[in-house]
Amino acid sequence: MELYIYNKELDLLGVLDTANAVIWNRRYYAPGEFEVHTAATEIALYLIQKQYIVAKPDSVEFGIIENVIIEQTEEGEFIKATGRLGSSYLARRIVFETTIISDTVENAMRTLVYENVINPDIADRAIPNIELGTLNSFAETVHFQVSYRNLLSTLTGLAETSGIGYRLRFDPALQKFYF
């Protein structure tokens, strides 16, 4: 399987085509996890770095490398890279202000992402290259208040309560993520 590897600036660094195993666990209400096992070749050592992005060619999902372990076996050196899927980016923010929402769950999620990731009051808190995607017009409604809680935990709670999943999608051509 080919895996495309991007740096933090979303530039394509190369294609990893030597993976012995790729485990890609999706979750509907939260970010999933992934694992990549490959021989520790020169190119693999260059491509497999913490915070780099792993994308499959047939999917809009992507993973963020969080841990890299180099293992020595009788067959040689191997790399084990693990991480979470793209929505885990949202764990890097808290809901900074007291927010009261009475709207559809979908709009509530979009509002939280917009106000805390895309266009926060404190510009330094913005995460670049994340935009809102297409509105799906789900009808489920919610009435809640949240403050100083992790954004990802808040979204996961809304998803589990309402039955509406979420994810960040990656568009490598535009170098953008869409919520």
Language-model regions: role of each:
Residues 41-43, 68-70, 164:
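Short beta-turn/strand-loop junction motif enriched in small, turn-promoting residues
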Residues 84-179:
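Charged- and aromatic-enriched interaction segments used to assemble
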Residues 32, 77-79, 175:
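Envelope-exposed proteins and targeting segments
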Residues 23-24, 67-72, 143-144:
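Catalytic micro-motifs at enzyme active sites that drive phosphoryl/nucleotidyl and oxygen chemistry
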Residues 1-47, 82-90, 107-110:
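Juxtamembrane "anchor/assembly" segments of surface/extracellular structural proteins
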Residues 53-84, 167-169:
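Short beta-strand and beta-hairpin "edge-sheet" elements
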Residues 44-56:
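Short coil-to-beta transition motif at edge beta-strands of beta-rich domains
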Residues 3-5, 36, 53-54, 65, ...:
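Hydrophobic beta-strand residues in large extracellular and virion-surface proteins
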